[in-house]
C-alpha cells in the first residue's frame, strides 16, 4: 500500500497523466497527432514542418528575442519545443495534401504526421473545413478553381503555392496552346 489515498478528481488526473505518458512512450505518433490537433495553440506549418534545421533557426531567433515576443509567438515557441522533441526522436512531417489532409486534425501517414490545413498561418478553422469539404467533392481544376470553391484569399493560395502544396496544379483554368505541344 502506498499510504496516500487519491480520491475523485485527483485519481482522474493521475490516471490521465499515466495514459498520456504511456502514449508518448509506446505510441509516439498518435501522441503527437493528438497533441497538435487538440492542445497546440499556435502551430505554424511553415516554421515547424520544413525540417529540423529551419525549426532550430526559428527557436534560436525566438530565444534571442524572448523578452519582445508577442503572446502568439510565445505559444508558437512552446509548440516548437514539442516539434523539436519529435524530430529528435526520429519522427517527421509529410506535406499537406490538398485532397487527404483534414481541416483541424493531424493524421499519421506512412510513419509521419500529416498536418491539418489549419496549421497554415492565416487559415482559420472555417476555411480549413471548407477546403476539406470541397476536396471531398472532386479534384480542383486549377489554383484559381481552388480559390473560388474554397473561398480562400489570394494570400492563402500564394502561401500554399510557395510551400509546394499544389504540386503540378496549374495556376489558371485557361488552356494554352503550349500545353498541347
Predicted segments — roles?
Residues 9-10, 14-181:
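Noncatalytic, beta-rich nucleic-acid-contacting surfaces in large DNA/RNA-processing enzymes
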Residues 1-8:
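Positively charged, low-complexity/disordered segments
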